[in-house]
Amino acid sequence: MRTLVALCLGLAATACGADMIEAFGLKWRVPIASDWKLETAEGIPALSLLVPRPSTEPRRPTQFALAETPDFLNVTLEAEMKQEPAALRNRHNSLMIAYAWKDANHFNYAHLSVDSAEEQKVHNGIFQVNGGDRVRISPEKGPASLTHEGWHTVKLVYDGVTGKVEVWVDGKTSPSLTAVDKRSGAGKAGIGSFFDLGQFRKVKITGQRAR
């Protein structure tokens, strides 16, 4: 038992038990632990999503790491993120941040894409999963978020009291990355992608529980 505990403490992003990984001082719940790997990107620890898995029906993201924190009513998630290079699979790539997660059928997420919502209505915006397919809850107006293939500085701020969520990418936000929904309430936050590869580093989650 002591040997197992020591091994778990030493393996930062290797599963210690089913579908759990560790990175950035947190434990994360994932569908398949071997799809993720803690690597070093430019001398900085980075969590890499190595396997793009297609979305199942109903249509919503499943390939994301969910932080094992309390259910936060107010939460801020900050990170540097890097999308899959377009040339790798000739795709229009994206990343996502989950928030107000209650279970696999009830959560919200911010979708950050190389194209705008005006180009593709189910890209680059705020979405809600409520037992079925994801539904857009933000306007479609605004530019693409992932405008280059380097590291992006990303910040999501969610206030469960007012229902407002806003996302900044490289210091900029837009109507498509802002939404208000008072039904969402408290939940957990996570990082990942719909069905693309990606890297995440300098991830920090702070929040406040519901009183």
Task: Cite the ranges covered by each PLM segment.
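Short, solvent-exposed beta-strand-to-loop segments that form ligand-recognition rims
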Residues: 33, 168-188
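Secretory/extracellular carbohydrate-interaction modules
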Residues: 57-128
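Extracellular carbohydrate-recognition regions
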Residues: 18-42
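Beta-strand-rich interaction surfaces with strong enrichment in secreted/lumenal proteins
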Residues: 63-70, 139-146, 189-190
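Ligand-recognition surfaces built from glycine- and aromatic
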Residues: 181-211
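Short tryptophan-centered beta-strand motifs in secreted/extracellular beta-sheet-rich domains
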Residues: 79, 150-160, 165-167
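Short, aromatic/His-centered strand-loop micro-motif at the edge of beta-sheets
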Residues: 130-153
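Short carbohydrate-recognition loop motifs
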Residues: 39-63
